[in-house]
Amino acid sequence: MFNKTPEQQQAIRNTIKLKMEGRETLTMSDIKTICPAVSTPSPSPELRKKLGITDRYVHVPTTQVIEDIQKLGWNPIEACQVNARKRKGYQRHMIKFVNPDFIVEGRDEYPELLLSNSHDGTTSFTLDVGIFRLICSNGMVIKTQDFGSMKVRHYGYDFEAIKSAVTELMQSIPGYLKQVEEMKQQKLEKDQMLDFARKAAMLRFAKTNEESIEKIVDLSDFLESTRKEDDGDGLWEVFNRIQEKVVNGKFQYAFGKKERKARPVKGFKQQVKLNQDLWELASSYVPEAVVAG
């Protein structure tokens, strides 16, 4: 990239962006171009001191983990990193993977793996499971009591460590897909839909309460469908309508008399957390007897 003109560099980035929008497999060169933090070299002693990285921290480039996950059948399709000044090159970043074996013809949903990491000594490698929905090109991240994120430490990292984490998550995927089917079967009453919308809005506006939130957002607007596939009173449809608006900012809100258009949640860490909390909220509307089955 460094021997390219600015115009050529932008053209390369645009091509990679189109690949990500089409959910095509990214090359390592693609990933390094849009997410340079994946290949940052081990910090020098001086930089370790400046960033507060302890001597116990063992540097494992994310590129190595990406290659290891690919060996397990998962292809990288998206990459991003947070903006940073002080920790530039060592900041948090995320890679998203899909496995062709889990893409079933005729099914609208399939799982994703989300790998997040940083090279500043503040985080372990973290793997989350997501569900991608073809209808709206929207992704959600799962959070349940039974299965959580998998963390792999830098210290003592080897292929078997990531293989074990990925294998354990893969074993949980059928259970997640079963939860999706249970949500599709669960119908909600009008008051339950409003309750869902209210609690979801409070996740987006964390400093609100049940009394104040309805002065900020129109809950009925949260429940409006933007596509026919999301029509209906099923929990899955209601969840998808609300999730898309809360995460992508497709709603109006007001503090006082001034009305504003909500913006999408930008940071991937915030996106993952909000998606996980929304999934947990949706799961609470499935009767325990159904979940246990």
List the model feature ranges, each with a label:
Residues M1-Q91, D195, A201, A292:
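N-terminal low-complexity, intrinsically disordered segments
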Residues K86-F102:
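Charged, often glycine-rich, active-site loop that binds/positions anionic groups
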